[in-house]
From Swiss-Prot:
Domain TCTP: 1-167
Family according to the record: Belongs to the TCTP family.
MF GO annotations: calcium ion binding
Organism of origin: Medicago sativa
Alphabetical list of Pfam families matching this protein: TCTP
Keyword field contains Transferase: no
Protein name: Translationally-controlled tumor protein homolog
Length: 167
C-alpha cells in the first residue's frame, strides 16, 4: 500500500486506495470522495421482530455520515479563504515547497503553479479547505468541492507536495 504524506509536515493526506486523476499539467490531483455512514452496527439474529411484536428496544444508533477521505486521514476543515488570503497562502507555499523539490521538479513547479492557482481561484467560492491532522500552518491545503449535480465531494491535492511512502 502507498501512502502520500505532506512533504512539508509529514501528515498522511491520501493513499493509493483512492485513485486520482492528474489535472492542470500534473500540478493537481483530483480524487473522488464518498459520504459513508460510520458507527452503524447491524445485527441479524434471525428473528422476525414484527412477528414477535418487538420494536427497536431503545438501541442508541450513533451512526454519523462522514466523508471517507476526511475521516480516514483525519483532515481538519479550515475557514474559507478570500482571494487575498488565498494568494497570500500560495506565495508563502511556493517559498516553502520549492526548496524541498529536486531541480527538475522545481522547474516544472514554477512553470505550472500559476495555471493551477488560476484553476483554484475560479473555484474559490465553492471550495472547502482542509489541512492534515497536525493542523500545521505551513502545511499543504487539501481542497474539496462538489461537481455539478454530484452528491459526493471531489478533492484537489497539490501533487508536488505529496511524498510517496510504502507501507
Amino acid at each position: 500500500m502507498l501512502v502520500y504524506q505532506d512533504l512539508l509536515t509529514g501528515d498522511e493526506l491520501l493513499s493509493d486506495s483512492y485513485p486520482y486523476k492528474e489535472i492542470e499539467n500534473g500540478m493537481l490531483w483530483e480524487v473522488e470522495g464518498k459520504w459513508v455512514t460510520k458507527g452503524v452496527v447491524e445485527v441479524d439474529i434471525g428473528a422476525n421482530a414484527s412477528a414477535e411484536g418487538g420494536e427497536d428496544e431503545g438501541v442508541d444508533d450513533t451512526a454519523v455520515k462522514v466523508v471517507d477521505i476526511v475521516d480516514v486521514f483525519r483532515l481538519q476543515e479550515q475557514p474559507a479563504f478570500d482571494k487575498k488570503q488565498f494568494l497570500g497562502f500560495v506565495k508563502r507555499y511556493i517559498k516553502l515547497l520549492t526548496p524541498k523539490l529536486d531541480a527538475e521538479k522545481q522547474e516544472l513547479f514554477k512553470k505550472h503553479i500559476e495555471g493551477a492557482t488560476k484553476y483554484l481561484l475560479c473555484k474559490l467560492k465553492d471550495l472547502q479547505f482542509f489541512v492534515g491532522e497536525s493542523m500545521h500552518d505551513d502545511g499543504s491545503l487539501v481542497f474539496a468541492y462538489y461537481k455539478d449535480g454530484a452528491a459526493d465531494p471531489t478533492f484537489l491535492y497539490f501533487a508536488y507536495a505529496l511524498k510517496e511512502i510504502k507501507c
